[in-house]
């Protein structure tokens, strides 16, 4: 048996931690899941010391397509053994890593709080390896969140590579949009410096947020919507007010991609 690819992470997890990412996936990728033939398989890669996120992913994806199946993959055998009592129809757990040892090519791979523990120069190769495992029309979602899921940033990738970056937050916890910088995924977190696109984006977002201060009397949601609407004049956003109301904003990857060098 080949050794799994990758190294064990800290395994930190909490119930409902990935709710923002899950809801976005069900919305953005739901149509592709429903078109999948055979039934779509989703992978929760590196689910951690307890299986909560895989259990929740199955429940949320089945609101988009009741045929969905979820495979939780962990590189630590003890974590797989601890998760097995939670197996049920549509939910299994498997020992593995970035090779993604599933019989079928997944329609979705979710890797949350995994690559944050790797070096930046390792990210591109891991992305490429995971994207190579996707089914046609599949999606890789890779990102980072805080311990209870209030702040989250992720990259969505297709078989061809990165497509978008999504920022999502519990608006009541936010002082300014750049607070999300500490949750940038590994490909971007060290690029939040002057001269880099992601730094310019967060700078402009903070300025739009400050300009929208009069809307704070209507609530944090209305202030966020106004700030994002203003931001859309200068940055290629891919979503609309329905998602902004959820405390989200999604930007084309090309606009935030790291500068060369």
Range-by-range predicted roles:
Residues 106-124:
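A short SAM/SAH-binding and catalytic strip from SAM-dependent methyltransferases
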Residues 43, 48-101:
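Class I SAM-dependent methyltransferase SAM/SAH-binding core
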Residues 153-223:
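A conserved mid-domain beta-alpha-beta active-site/ligand-binding segment of alpha/beta enzyme cores
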Residues 1-40, 44, 49-51:
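Class I SAM-dependent methyltransferase Rossmann-like catalytic core
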Residues 199-261:
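Conserved Class I S-adenosyl-L-methionine
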Residues 37-39, 67, 105-106, 137:
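A general structural motif
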Residues 134-149:
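Conserved beta-strand signature within the Rossmann-like core of class I S-adenosyl-L-methionine
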Residues 116, 124-136:
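A short glycine-rich, Lys/Arg-flanked "PGG" loop and its adjoining helix->strand segment in the class I
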């Amino acid at each position: 048996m080949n050794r799994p690819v990758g190294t064990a992470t800290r395994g930190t997890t909490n119930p409902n931690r990935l709710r923002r990412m899950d809801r976005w996936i069900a919305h953005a990728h739901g149509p592709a899941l429903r078109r999948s033939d055979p039934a779509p398989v989703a992978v929760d890669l590196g689910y951690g010391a307890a299986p909560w996120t895989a259990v929740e992913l199955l429940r949320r994806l089945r609101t988009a397509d009741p045929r969905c199946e979820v495979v939780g993959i962990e590189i630590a055998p003890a974590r797989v053994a601890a998760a097995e009592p939670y197996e049920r129809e549509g939910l299994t757990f498997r020992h593995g890593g970035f090779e993604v040892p599933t019989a079928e090519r997944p329609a979705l791979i979710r890797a949350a709080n995994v690559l944050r523990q790797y070096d930046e120069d390792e990210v591109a190769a891991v992305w490429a390896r995971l994207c190579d495992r996707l089914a046609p029309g599949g999606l890789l979602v890779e990102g980072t969140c805080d311990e209870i899921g209030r702040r989250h940033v992720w990259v969505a990738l297709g078989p061809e590579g990165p497509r978008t970056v999504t920022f999502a937050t519990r608006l009541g916890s936010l002082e300014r949009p750049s607070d999300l910088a500490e949750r940038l995924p590994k490909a971007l977190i060290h690029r939040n410096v002057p001269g880099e696109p992601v730094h310019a984006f967060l700078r402009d977002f903070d300025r739009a947020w400050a300009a929208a201060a009069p809307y704070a009397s209507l609530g944090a949601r209305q202030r966020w919507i106004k700030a994002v609407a203003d931001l859309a004049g200068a940055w290629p956003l891919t979503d609309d007010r329905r998602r902004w109301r959820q405390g989200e904003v999604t930007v084309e990857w090309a606009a935030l991609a790291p500068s060369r060098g």
